[in-house]
Regions:
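Residue-level recognition of oxygen-bearing side chains
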Residues: 23, 27
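A general structural-boundary detector
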Residues: 2, 19-22, 40, 86
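Short, small/polar residue-rich loop motifs at catalytic or cofactor-binding pockets
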Residues: 3-6, 29
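Asp-based phosphoryl-transfer active-site loop
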Residues: 5-22, 44, 99
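Active-site phosphate-binding/coordination module
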Residues: 28-112
């Protein structure tokens, strides 16, 4: 694939987009700006809730130049410029008690 064919750049946050201090370095910012200038859609991907990612999206200017947030480990995709939910998939609440009981039986925690 040639670079001109790249349309989307999806980046995990912690340790990928940000460094050990949870900071986006100037070099990374410049690379993101260059990609966006070429029409590449920047997607911030995380297991965090949307509200936990939006401040970084705004800091990077994705609310103005476009981009998306992929939150809840892929459970939601939000357009940063409009706030529109492009995709949402939720677990039906009726399954939660059964899943919690199973997790307790297995001695594991449920991480969302």
């Amino acid at each position: 694939m040639e670079k001109k064919d790249i349309r989307v750049l999806a980046l995990d946050l912690d340790g990928t987009l940000t460094n050990d201090q949870k900071v986006v370095t100037p070099a990374t910012r410049a690379a993101l700006d260059a990609a966006a200038a070429k029409g590449v859609t920047i997607v911030l991907a995380s297991g965090r809730p949307t509200a936990g990612i939006m401040p970084l999206a705004k800091e990077l200017g994705l609310d103005k130049k476009g981009g998306c947030i992929l939150s809840y480990n892929g459970g939601a995709i939000i357009d940063c410029a409009t706030g529109e939910t492009l995709y949402r998939k939720q677990l039906d609440a009726k399954y939660v008690p059964q899943l919690c009981a199973f997790a307790r039986e297995q001695g594991v925690a449920i991480v969302t």
